[in-house]
Design a protein with these regions (language model features):
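Extended, compositionally biased low-complexity polar/Lys-Gly-rich tracts
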Residues: 1-5, 36, 67-83, 184-213
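Feature activates predominantly on carbohydrate-active enzymes
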Residues: 1-18, 24-28, 32-36, 119-120
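Aromatic-lined carbohydrate-recognition surfaces of secreted/lumenal glycan-active proteins
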Residues: 5, 83-105, 126-132, 137, ...
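Acidic-and-aromatic substrate-binding clefts and catalytic sites of carbohydrate-active enzymes
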Residues: 9-22, 30, 42-49, 56-68, ...
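Aromatic-lined substrate-binding rim segments of carbohydrate-active enzymes
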Residues: 19-92, 140-161, 217-229
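Substrate-binding cleft of secreted/luminal carbohydrate-active enzymes
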Residues: 26, 35-41, 201, 205-214, ...
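An active-site-proximal structural segment forming one wall of the substrate-binding cleft
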Residues: 29, 63-80, 98-126, 143, ...
Length: 289
């Protein structure tokens, strides 16, 4: 595992309420484990934002943040010689309601602001396109393409990363009655999506937790095949929490993680990010083991 997400702002994982000292200790633990890349999973979600972004404060009904988490993470990444990828703002509404241009415009303005304010950090080395999807969604590729293209243009072609999920048996939609996609359906749909993202997305890192363990290898092989076809690096996103438990979410059983790691190695993954170190793998986690 060479990378981890930084789960601020969180979607469904409880916050640990760390300050600079606690995060410094955790970045040191990451480095000691071999992690060299940290990815801010999103700049904001709905009303909550990770820093006082003027472009979002000016137009969106958001809370003013008490601290600048982006500056803190960048300073720590500088200190521990890590690469930092900046994740986009997820409105939580516009793209779900079909107003894709609003989502795009917000993030294009945010990219300009963020690069001007933080681009001097040596650790600022990439972008993460935060909106997560599992299959063809009308105009979803347009968000990835336009936001990703603009991020690369303003930053001198820094790499972009996406981490979609597989529409498998463990997704909420399928557990609520939707039908899981087969491996062949997954390949067909993502071939269409990725054909529109060639040259815009550099790292493809599918989440690995929404399919059953006996199915995972076949999906990994397809993911690698598609990434190779469209000139992308193929990473895997190891979920280090356990979807099989009745509680959302607790650390994964190490045997399960090892099984997934062996499958990823066999399938030829070129890198591995986890969601995520600080809650589910760190010696500093509130989930003590």
């Amino acid at each position: 595992i060479n990378a981890t997400f930084l789960d601020e702002i969180s979607w469904d994982i409880p916050h640990q309420n760390w300050g600079v000292e606690e995060w410094d200790r955790d970045f040191r633990a990451m480095r000691d484990m071999g992690i060299n890349t940290v990815v801010l999973i999103r700049a904001g979600l709905g009303r909550w934002i990770a820093a006082p972004f003027e472009s979002i404060l000016a137009t969106e009904d958001v809370y003013y943040p008490p601290v600048d988490l982006v500056e803190m993470f960048l300073c720590l990444a500088d200190k521990y010689d890590m690469a930092f990828y900046f994740g986009m703002y997820d409105s939580g509404k516009y793209w779900h309601e079909g107003d894709y241009m609003k989502e795009i415009d917000l993030n294009i303005k945010l990219i300009d602001e963020v690069w001007e304010k933080y681009g001097h950090h040596k650790s600022f080395q990439g972008w993460y396109l935060s909106q997560e999807v599992s299959r063809r969604t009308k105009n979803m590729t347009k968000i990835y393409a336009e936001v990703g293209r603009h991020a690369k243009e303003v930053s001198g072609n820094l790499p972009t990363m996406v981490s979609p999920y597989i529409h498998g048996v463990k997704t909420d939609q399928v557990m609520w009655g939707d039908k899981a996609t087969t491996v062949s359906e997954h390949e067909f749909e993502w071939n269409e999506i990725l054909s529109n993202l060639q040259g815009v997305v550099d790292i493809l890192a599918f989440q690995d937790g929404q399919v059953d363990y006996h199915e995972l290898y076949d999906y990994l092989v397809v993911n690698k095949k598609l990434a190779d076809k469209y000139g992308m690096k193929c990473w895997t996103n190891f979920e280090s929490f356990d979807r099989d438990m009745p509680i959302r979410f607790l650390p994964i059983k190490w045997e399960k993680l090892l099984l997934k790691m062996e499958m990823a190695r066999k399938a030829g993954m070129e890198g591995a990010i986890t969601f995520e170190f600080s809650h589910f793998m760190s010696p500093n986690s509130e989930y003590s083991q």
